[in-house]
Amino acid sequence: QFDKGCIWAMQSWSLREDIVKAVPRENLLILDLAGKRVRRDQGFWGYPTVIGNLHNFGGRINMHGDLHLLAANQYQDIKKVYPNVCGDGLFMEAVEQNPVYYDLAFEMFHRTDKVNIHTWLQQYAQRRYGARTVNTDQAMRLLLEGPYRRNTNGTERSSIVAARPALNVKKSGPNAGLGIPYDPLILFKAERLLLADAELLKHSKPYRFDVVDVMRQIMTNIGQPIHKKAAEAFEAKDKTAFALHSGRFLQMLEDMDELLRTRPEYSFDRWLTEARSWGETKAEKDLMEQDATTLLTVWGAQEGNDPGIFDYAWREWSGLINGFYKVRWQKFYSMLQKHLDEGTGYSEEGLKLSHGRESFRANDFYISLGDWELDYTRQVNKARTPITQGDEIEIAKRLFRKYEKLSAAYYQTKVSNADIIKTEKTYENLGE
């Protein structure tokens, strides 16, 4: 039995014209999750369509999002060309990241006009912080020039923090790579301006969130050249330089964990505590924690099979950094140090890849690491108490001074990844 009046909702990832036209128009609603295919596929041949933005995959933490695109009101523009477009939506896989993006996106649902993004950002900062200052205005302009610039929609860039360790780290999750699509020094300028108003804005919780978020992004960005220096030192057999740069990288992970522990939004400990609360018995609580851990680490694996899209839902979260990501990097650097001490080499050339990065058990190191990762998902009672600890502004100021000094050593030339980003395969549809 079936309802003859039902409406099928179909995602547009792999639609084919023959499949679509086999269904009466009144019984089909197409969801163009990223708003890209409607133009390519002739407006889906007149079928009712909802366009939108798929801004986040897996709950990953990365500052990004094309605010210019949102402000241009893409729904109204597309509807003029394809009248069958009947709605606009957001199809993110998780929230609690990039609040400025969602604030504007939800506002645009209620508007038929375009928005002056510069004016809107000034008003947004005033609403968010409870005051408007020259510093916050300038900081917002810099963020628009940086992570929220044009062509930053869709798949977020990878995290060196959450990436499985390698000499040549290609990506963290199975999607986009590590390229930073803006000058990372922009964030230092923005954070300096935000921190300058700390005394005035310290009572604003959103201000405290933003100060932490920008500092987090500064640290994950600079982590890339720090690790690159460590890898270069290993290949040059320079033990002193290797110890310096690998030590700085591991310390950066500890610093980031301390910073993010100030906010519940960035807490793996909160995630695990809430997961356990769903269980009634100890066995149920343990299972909930194991499932919640698996989701953010190996993603999932059937008995006897290795994970295929491990680290799909990576998060730069306190607790997860300290207990999982840092341990992976410690194991990797210890392995490299052993090779240096013994005068032997280590190469990743020719290793089997999975979605553009080394597969789960690509060599002896990854076999051992994979065993540890799977064992980690089975551990219980990992949550630390208290869940939050420390003052956001105090810690952000201290870390800003530290990493601003380090930036001179690691950003000696202007960083540009534009060409790499344009040509890389991001696997937005993991069935590809």
Residue ranges and their predicted role:
Residues 208-212, 216, 224-229, 237-421:
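C-terminal amphipathic alpha-helical interaction region
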Residues 169, 174-203, 207-235:
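C-terminal substrate/ligand-recognition segments
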Residues 1-157, 161-184, 235-243, 247-250, ...:
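Catalytic-core regions of glycoside hydrolase
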Residues 98-99, 197-204, 260-263:
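Membrane-interface helix-loop junctions at the exits of transmembrane helices
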Residues 101-109, 215, 219, 325, ...:
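Short, Φ-rich (hydrophobic/aromatic) sequence segments
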